[in-house]
Amino acid sequence: MMIQEELEATKQQFCIELDQVHSSKDLFDLKVRYLGKKGLFRCFADKLRECPSDQKALMGASINACKTYIEDLIRDKNNAILLAEESAEFLKEKIDITLPGEPQCPGGKHIVKKVLDDVVDIFVHLGFCVREAPNIESEENNFSLLNFEENHPARQMHDTFYLDAKTVLRTHTSNVQVRELSRGEPPIKVVAPGLCFRNEDISARSHVIFHQVEAFYVDRNVTLSDLTEMLTEFYHTFFERKIELRLRHSYFPFVEPGIEVDVSCECQAAGCSLCKHTGWLEVAGAGMIHPQVLRNSGVDPETYTGYAVGMGIERLAMLKHGISDIRLFCENDLRFLQQFS
């Protein structure tokens, strides 16, 4: 048999065998059998060496053409097999829409977020505008312009996170006061929610990061009575019950006079673990804005006065819901969080 006839017979036999191939493995085996180092085309290479010199070029071209033909068929078959395998895999993964669905647990607001939103909503209802200030603040805005002395303990690194010599993570949301008062003439009535950071030991009652709301009002003839009236209305709404307010003198650099704000406990002075058997719950620090803070902000304290109050959101959540450990808010324990969802 002439080489040309053998090549044609090889092509026909290959096509017959190729039609029986339906997997990548079988196709690989067929390719090795024909084109491998010990495959059928090896014998054509041997015959080419024995061929007369004047016929070698023609025979070589015929062998290469046959080999290319088989390689093209193998490539096309491989593509077809891959497509079929992908389609089969896709069908396996197809979703049966007739199957019953799996129940999904709906998400909900974190208890701290819920309380924060409630607090802000109450202040907005009382006529305050919502403003924000940055978490990263200059030492000047966080301390100096709020009347903190140079040697005040709060400025020390063991109480405050310093990013550099003049930049801190804010220790309170009071930094909004200077920013807002510097923008224009009173009246200004602002509530500012946000995160605060303090370099403290983490315990059941304190954390290095917490939420705070600052509310302040500056206008002509604002008095301590206005502050008391606002606080009474706020806490009555927040705790959803009638409350008594108790103001205790305290010291804060940015207010004068400064006061600690207590509200009557739900135990009605009978004494309980929540109020530590005192009948009162400490809820905020407040006071009349210090004249020097007004001056630092470009406001004339002879013409305008104002009050300010700052309250920790985690503390309010703990008091309202009887939570004993502030660390629970950060632990992502669903057994705890789902009680408030």
UniProtKB/Swiss-Prot annotation:
Keywords for the protein's UniProt record, in alphabetical order: Aminoacyl-tRNA synthetase, ATP-binding, Cytoplasm, Ligase, Magnesium, Metal-binding, Nucleotide-binding, Protein biosynthesis
Entry's localization field: Cytoplasm
Cofactor remark from the record: Binds 2 magnesium ions per tetramer.
EC number(s) recorded for this UniProt protein: 6.1.1.20
Translocase as UniProt keyword: no
CDD domains: PheRS_alpha_core
Pfam families: Phe_tRNA-synt_N (PF02912), tRNA-synt_2d (PF01409)
PROSITE patterns in the record: AA_TRNA_LIGASE_II
GO molecular function, one term: magnesium ion binding
InterPro entries: aa-tRNA-synth_II, aa-tRNA-synth_II/BPL/LPL, Phe-tRNA-synth_IIc_asu, Phe-tRNA_ligase_II_N, Phe_tRNA_ligase_alpha1_bac, Phenylalanyl-tRNA_Synthase, tRNA-bd_arm
NCBIfam families: pheS
Protein name: Phenylalanine--tRNA ligase alpha subunit
Source species of the chain: Chlamydia caviae (strain ATCC VR-813 / DSM 19441 / 03DC25 / GPIC) (Chlamydophila caviae)
Lineage start: Bacteria, Pseudomonadati, Chlamydiota, Chlamydiia, Chlamydiales
Gene that encodes it: pheS
